[in-house]
Design a protein with these regions (language model features):
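Zn2+-dependent metallopeptidase catalytic core
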Residues: 94-122
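A short glycine-rich, hydrophobically flanked beta-strand micro-motif that places a catalytic Asp/Glu
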Residues: 123-127
Length: 200
């Protein structure tokens, strides 16, 4: 906050608004899944202790959403079923209106992957409701956050149950200029095959 081009660099001080949000963990933890370095997942490190050890052992479990079928029998037969609790991402109301349909489509396109795993309507994008009791900083709501900044980047912090790796909530934060970064990547990576990329 006190370096670079940020306002605090000139004044030497800044006022910061902080938010703390606490949520109860599920009474029954989700079944954890051990991490495999051959597959790319974010991980929770685990240190194991037991009476039989002379030294602790280390491992990791993957971070993932808890998707449970509403109709287990249908799911076991290999038929698509909706989850008990779908993954819902809200669109930050500060998002430029032009991009909202594309962000919603990008989230909803993930349903193709979830259908391959047996779930339909597993992930949903919604516009932020006009509800004064809801807060973008509330740990109960996953949000696609828009950050009006010249930074060319995006990131995705998550709140995860440390016992199981269950993702309780996630924010996908994208800076305004991330589109310029994507354009550069596309030009470099696809330029040899896509003539449109050669003239970007």
């Amino acid at each position: 906050i006190t370096s670079g081009k940020l306002p605090a660099a000139a004044t030497g001080s800044v006022t910061v608004k902080l938010n703390t949000s606490m949520v109860m963990l599920p009474k029954e933890p989700m079944q954890p899944r051990l991490a495999d370095e051959r597959v790319g997942f974010f991980q929770n490190p685990v240190t194991e202790f037991s009476d039989e050890q002379q030294v602790t052992s280390r491992g990791a479990i993957i971070q993932r959403y808890r998707l449970e079928p509403k109709d287990p029998e249908r799911y076991r037969r290999g038929q698509l079923t909706e989850p008990k609790r779908p993954i819902v991402y809200y669109i930050d109301p500060a998002t430029p209106k032009k991009w909202i349909p594309y962000l919603k489509a990008g989230v909803n396109d993930w349903n193709v992957a979830f259908e391959a795993a047996g779930f339909k309507n597993a992930i949903i994008a919604k516009e932020w409701p006009d509800d004064p009791t809801m807060s973008l900083d509330d740990a109960r709501y996953s949000v696609l956050r828009y950050l009006p900044s010249e930074t060319e980047n995006a990131y995705g912090p998550r709140i995860v149950d440390p016992r199981s790796g269950e993702i309780m909530e996630s924010h996908i934060c994208w800076y305004h200029n991330v589109m310029n970064l994507l354009k550069k990547w596309y030009m470099v990576q696809c330029g040899p095959l896509d003539k449109r990329a050669q003239s970007m």
